[in-house]
Regions:
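Hydrophobic transmembrane alpha-helices of multi-pass small-molecule transport proteins
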Residues: 56, 120-126, 133-152, 286-303
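Juxtamembrane helix-start motifs in multi-pass secondary transporters
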Residues: 44-45, 107, 195
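Alpha-helical transmembrane segments of compact multi-pass small-molecule transporters, enriched
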Residues: 51-55, 110-124, 139, 201-206, ...
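Alpha-helical transmembrane segments
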Residues: 83, 130-141, 191-203
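Membrane-interface interhelical linkers
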Residues: 2-24, 29-43, 47-82, 92-102, ...
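Hydrophobic residues within membrane-embedded alpha-helical segments of Major Facilitator Superfamily
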Residues: 17, 24, 31, 51, ...
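Hydrophobic/small/kink-forming positions within alpha-helical transmembrane segments
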Residues: 26, 57, 85-89, 116-120, ...
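Hydrophobic alpha-helical transmembrane segments in multi-pass integral membrane proteins
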Residues: 56-66, 118-130, 173-188, 240-253, ...
Length: 304
């Protein structure tokens, strides 16, 4: 790591991490889509969170990360725990629901809501003014979703699936945006690996509680140990919930939020391409236009 840090500035390294995060996450989404054919969203989320939590423990030890970092207060721990519950237990479960209903390509377009939602939350919570460019970018993203869904006749998806798929996706992005917003101040004062692990632990515990109180808890727990489910779920977890998550948190720590978010948003392009190639999802002109509008809107928002 020292050699890498010597070759690149922290800001450049953060940008590289953000781009790699987008690539790994796009591949993971394809695998998670395949996993969702055998595992329900709640059990799939618990599986990937539990495996990622366990995988990160030896990484923390080898990296020499202080398990009880100095300079943090009880409030900081509480913020990260809440961030993990909202951003992992709730947001990721909603994302998997959206992925099952929409498919990878359309879900990638919904992901473009992430940037406008961050701006909206900062306006509602922090009373930050909304600029003309931010408003324009948000409208472009909304246009992308309308282009992708209005008057779409797809045999494999009903109007109800499209509606709920986009609602689940929008809710997932909202919860994720909120979790990032409250996490950032603590992240500036702590190891990104440590922050990632604490959020994972909080999210995993919350998911276990959610499964225990679910009426289908026996099936949900059973699917966690069914070996046939590991074919896609395990590599998806390695790429998406372990590598991509570590890179994601590290990127936000080492470079500006806007730079990291813009590069993260390139996952939209990767997902649409991979979905067409690996999942044989239709790559129509309408979907291409929606992807361009969504990506363009996200960039306009972040540059504004």
């Amino acid at each position: 790591m020292g050699l890498i840090e010597g070759m690149f500035t922290p800001d450049m390294l953060g940008k590289i991490f953000a781009f790699l995060c987008a690539l790994f996450w796009a591949l993971a989404v394809i695998l998670f889509k395949k996993s969702g054919e055998a595992m329900k969203p709640l059990s799939l989320n618990l599986y990937k969170s539990l495996v990622s939590t366990l995988l990160l423990i030896p990484v923390l030890i080898l990296a020499g990360v202080d398990l009880l970092p100095e300079g943090l207060f009880a409030r900081d721990y509480l913020i990260l725990i809440v961030s993990g519950i909202i951003g992992i237990a709730i947001s990721d479960t909603l994302f998997f629901k959206s992925l099952n209903l929409l498919g990878a390509g359309l879900t990638a377009i919904v992901d473009c809501l992430y940037s406008p939602i961050i701006i909206l939350l900062s306006f509602l919570i922090l009373l930050n003014p909304v600029s003309f460019m931010e408003l324009t970018g948000g409208l472009l993203v909304i246009s992308a979703i309308l282009v992708a869904t209005l008057k779409v006749k797809e045999k494999e998806r009903s109007t109800r699936d499209l509606l709920f798929g986009f609602l689940y996706g929008a809710a997932a992005m909202t919860f994720m945006g909120f979790s990032v917003t409250i996490m950032k101040p603590v992240l500036d004062r702590a190891s990104s690996l440590w922050v990632t692990e604490l959020r994972l632990i909080a999210g995993t515990i919350a998911l276990i509680v959610m499964v225990m109180f679910n009426k289908d808890r026996r099936e949900l727990f059973t699917s966690l140990i069914r070996r046939s489910n590991f074919k896609y779920a395990f590599p998806a977890t390695i790429l998406g919930s372990f590598l991509a998550l570590v890179l994601w948190v590290s990127a936000f720590k080492m470079t500006s939020i806007n730079s990291a978010a813009i590069l993260n948003q390139t996952n939209t392009i990767f997902i649409v391409i991979f979905a067409s190639f690996f999942l044989k999802e239709k790559f129509t002109f309408r979907r291409l236009l929606a992807t361009i509008l969504g990506m363009g809107g996200s960039v306009v928002v972040l540059l504004g």
